[in-house]
Amino acid sequence: MKLFDYAPLSLAWREFLQSEFKKPYFLEIEKRYLEALKSPKTIFPKSSNLFYALNLTPPSAVKIILLGQDPYHSTYLENEQELPVAMGLSFSVEKNAPIPPSLKNIFKELHANLGVPVPCCGDLSAWAKRGMLLLNAILSVEKNQAASHQYIGWEAFSDQILMRLFKTTAPLIVVLLGKVAQKKIALIPKNKHIIITAPHPSPLSRGFLGSGVFSSVQKAYREVYRKDFDFSL
């Protein structure tokens, strides 16, 4: 079986990325990911959500990109069942999962900047449906092992996704939180898209709270689309 048998990808993205899927680097990603999936190890997010960020936001609908590093590797209990926190969207968690510290800080800053009520759950899929691509640079992870799937090679694929999007004519608003995400600035054509940077929202990082990052995003969105982005959840 092929990757897309385990991890569905929408027709719009298959057409947009068609030439990538036969390249040696992608065939190697497919091989390594399927090997990990078939091993005794537990892989997050579940394979059906591997491309959830892409499936919720078609290429033609992307207006904002909020880049993450890799999926949450932790679990939570629901009805005595251990479930993955990760759901395939950067920073987002399953509806009934506890809100992680980084996401709590995102909600705090969003409220401080724009007065958006702090939501009771951490599912950001509504943002994705409104045109915010919530893409992780690395798409999978082993349970309880942060950054364990760097070896798979996902970043080569996510870089291609970004570079293809950056070739579009409409200005994109690219939000890069933290030094790792900000390395992607090198991929972005100069003077074509709007780049907004801030420290990582992790409590271990300093400077995110009070950065005004969401005020900057909203200002840029108004300039490009003549309306506000709806951050409500």
Curated annotation (Swiss-Prot):
Keywords: Cytoplasm, DNA damage, DNA repair, Hydrolase. It comes from the Bacteria. The active site is at D70 (proton acceptor). It is an enzyme of class 3 (hydrolase). It is found in: Cytoplasm. GO terms for biological process: base-excision repair, AP site formation via deaminated base removal. Pfam families: UDG. It catalyses: Hydrolyzes single-stranded DNA or mismatched double-stranded DNA and polynucleotides, releasing free uracil. GO terms for molecular function: uracil DNA N-glycosylase activity. InterPro entries: UDG_fam1, Ura-DNA_Glyclase_AS, Uracil-DNA_glycosylase-like, Uracil-DNA_glycosylase-like_sf. One of its GO terms (cellular component) is cytoplasm. Belongs to the uracil-DNA glycosylase (UDG) superfamily. UNG family. Excises uracil residues from the DNA which can arise as a result of misincorporation of dUMP residues by DNA polymerase or due to deamination of cytosine. HAMAP family: UDG. This is Uracil-DNA glycosylase. The lineage of its organism: Bacteria, Pseudomonadati, Campylobacterota, Epsilonproteobacteria, Campylobacterales.
